[in-house]
């Protein structure tokens, strides 16, 4: 009886050892998945390197082209309009609402989006439910944008491209901040919309740009990214520069500017410092954000041009 039990136990032990050996071999054969550091939002990875990408954010689309991985994009949103080469890519919806069937039909290895897109009822949870590999990035400041570019470079295997193209981008941003350092900061109102009056708070990418470009955001003490402001608060803050941006039709710009021109006691109105800023340069956390930073610095400190 003891001999039979010993043989059975030895047989089980051999089976376990064999299974462990197979697992080790399989682990050796599985391709390594690029590691993305903590600091971005949720990630669900596909086997590396992903070859069929769907971008649900214009900023990510621009970053992928910056990293010379645009040829891997098989689907984008209707808001993805830069660079021009993206215009012929299949569309899978808007920034907030996407067509799940269209995404599934494209058989992506990975779907990429920004974390803010997952904060509402039309969130990206459905991607997880359908077991679609996805990545959610976050960039609420310029340094976070640079980290996002580095992370996407690792994820797509484009590290060498990032090593060549990212340092000049960072250098331009540093030069702007050095140029405005120590200069008086004009008080700035950035109007996203007028009815109701929506501006940018401390947690927004635009708020970060205003500060780095040498301005003082009059809504800096508000934690919300896009708070609703009121006229009394603006009049009390006495902005020296008023910026207009947002997704409203360009035809509405004269009306929006004329509204503020009636408040002649505002320093910005007295000095004629009311400016339109192309939304994609300051609203979209992609490589062109540095263009937006340079533009804002020139508007805030024209004497330094």
Question: What is each model feature region?
Answer:
Residues 46-52, 110, 121-198, 219-224, ...:
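Extracytoplasmic substrate-binding proteins
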């Amino acid at each position: 009886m003891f001999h039979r039990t010993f043989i059975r136990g030895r047989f089980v032990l051999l089976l376990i050892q064999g299974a462990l050996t197979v697992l080790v071999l399989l682990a050796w054969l599985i391709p390594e998945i690029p590691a993305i550091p903590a600091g971005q939002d949720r990630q669900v990875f596909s086997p590396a390197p992903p070859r069929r990408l769907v971008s649900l954010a214009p900023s990510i689309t621009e970053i992928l082209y910056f990293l010379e991985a645009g040829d891997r994009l098989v689907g984008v949103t209707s808001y993805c309009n830069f660079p021009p080469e993206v215009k012929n890519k299949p569309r899978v919806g808007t920034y907030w609402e996407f067509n799940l069937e269209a995404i599934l039909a494209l058989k992506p290895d990975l779907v990429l989006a920004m974390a803010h897109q997952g904060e509402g009822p039309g969130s990206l949870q459905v991607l997880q439910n359908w077991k679609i590999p996805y990545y959610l990035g976050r960039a609420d400041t310029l340094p976070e944008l640079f980290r996002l570019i580095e992370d996407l470079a690792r994820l797509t295997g484009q590290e060498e491209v990032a090593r060549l193209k990212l340092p000049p981008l960072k250098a331009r941003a540093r030069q702007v901040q050095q140029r405005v350092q120590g200069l008086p900061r004009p008080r700035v109102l950035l109007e996203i919309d007028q009815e109701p009056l929506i501006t940018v708070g401390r947690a927004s990418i635009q708020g970060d740009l205003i500060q780095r470009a040498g301005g003082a955001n009059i809504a800096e003490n508000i934690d919300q990214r896009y708070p609703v402001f009121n006229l009394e608060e603006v009049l009390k803050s006495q902005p020296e520069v008023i910026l207009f941006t947002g997704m409203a039709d360009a035809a509405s710009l004269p009306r929006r500017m004329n509204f503020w021109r009636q408040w002649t006691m505002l320093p910005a109105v007295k000095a004629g410092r009311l400016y339109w800023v192309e939304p994609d340069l300051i609203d979209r956390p992609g490589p062109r954000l540095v263009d937006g930073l340079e533009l804002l610095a020139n508007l805030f400190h024209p004497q330094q041009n």
